[in-house]
Design a protein with these regions (language model features):
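Acidic, metal/ion-coordinating pockets
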Residues: 1-158
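Solvent-exposed loop/linker segments at secondary-structure transitions
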Residues: 139-366
Length: 367
């Protein structure tokens, strides 16, 4: 933990809620050791402030040794590292290969649905996707560590309710309502809007390089909020990225909790949850560079980096070289039609602070 005020508050919360480097639980007559690690890729995307993360391989080796010394018979690693189709880039496979003694790695971060576990260096690597869509079940022999059964059980409206988990969820909701939302006059289940059609969750086809109705709503909302605040009636471009959109909306009432689910990352200097919005002016030539990053990086290299625009569109050719795919870009006027971007003209752009912090790197690109 860092020494600044926020980091120390995080440390206190960690301690108050029973946080620990590792834990041993007794189940079925066996001692099961648990520990967690943070992956390199997830650290890269984390707004960690002054907090630092030690090398996960060294941490894992240390934890395995401690757990064995304290009598753990099965060792489970909760990993926010993830897997990759390319095993040389698959962090949890690398972890299993480099650290002996881990029996199971429950893999997170990449939201991978592993229909069959990966077996590497006597370690079972499992992953049940994201957002509670599946319940993962791995049954192994506690003595031989051989796999007996593995299932991904879909969580649907017909799934039986676990009363213990349901009570815990209600406890958390009451805590959020009383200690956070109440000061703004809201509750988690309060309806604040309605949609007569579903807004698509980007995770329905995360690798697809295509438009998204939820992203359209978010970027349009950015523009609307900007105009309310600045009283500027000129056309404005809204910009966000796939990686910070966390869910869609189903048809019907829109609740406070659902809005938070969709845009729940970050925090502003005022202490409010969510990345604050920022309004900047960008030259047309830089807008074209942003479009190029979207096409070359968001489509071909980093799925999380796909960008979504309100008030701007561009045309590209797949037959051109990387970082040179974009043919032209256009912005939408208040009259609703599109006109070509002028390279030397300044255009108002509203985005969130996370995206804004990445924009300076655009000017360093050469293409």
């Amino acid at each position: 933990f860092g020494e600044d005020e926020e980091s120390q508050a995080l440390k206190k919360a960690w301690e108050d809620h029973g946080g620990a480097e590792y834990k041993i639980i007794d189940r079925g007559g066996y001692k099961i050791g648990l520990f967690g690690v943070m992956g390199e890729d997830s650290v890269y995307y984390t707004a960690a402030g002054s907090n630092t993360f030690p090398d996960r391989i060294e941490v894992a080796k240390k934890m395995v040794q401690k757990l064995k010394e304290e009598g753990a018979q099965v060792i489970v690693c909760l990993s926010h590292s993830g897997t990759n189709k390319d095993s040389s880039k698959s962090e949890d496979e690398i972890l299993a290969q480099k650290v002996d003694g881990i029996d199971v790695i429950i893999s997170g971060h990449t939201h991978t649905v592993l229909t069959e576990p990966i077996h590497k260096n006597k370690t079972w690597i499992v992953s049940a996707g994201c957002f509670g869509k599946y319940l993962g079940l791995l049954d192994i022999d506690a003595k031989t560590k051989e796999k007996i059964d593995y299932q991904l059980i879909p969580i649907t409206a017909e799934s039986p309710v676990d009363q213990t988990i349901s009570a815990k969820i209600q406890e958390y909701k009451t805590d959020v309502n009383e200690n956070y939302l109440k000061q703004y006059g809201y509750t988690m289940d309060q309806s604040i809007g309605y949609t007569n059609f579903p807004l698509t969750d980007v995770y329905e086809d995360y690798s697809a390089f295509t438009g998204n109705s939820m992203a359209d709503l978010i970027t349009d909302a950015y523009v609307y909020a900007s105009k309310l605040t600045t009283k500027d009636t000129s056309f404005t471009i809204g910009l966000t990225a796939k990686g910070i959109i966390r869910s869609g909306l189903v048809k019907g009432d829109i609740t406070v909790g659902e809005v938070y689910d969709a845009v729940n990352l970050g925090k502003g200097n005022d202490g409010l949850l969510g990345y604050p919005l920022i309004r900047v002016y960008m030259k047309g030539s830089d807008l074209i560079k942003v479009a190029e990053l979207d096409r070359s990086v968001g489509k071909d290299m980093m799925v999380d980096g796909q960008l979504f625009f309100s008030g701007m569109q561009y045309h590209y050719s797949d037959y051109r070289f990387i970082l040179n795919h974009v043919v032209d870009a256009e912005v939408r006027t208040n009259a609703g039609f599109y006109i070509p971007v002028e390279k030397d003209k300044l255009y108002p752009v509203v985005t969130n602070l996370y995206i804004a912090n990445m924009l300076p790197s655009v000017g360093k690109k050469t293409f």
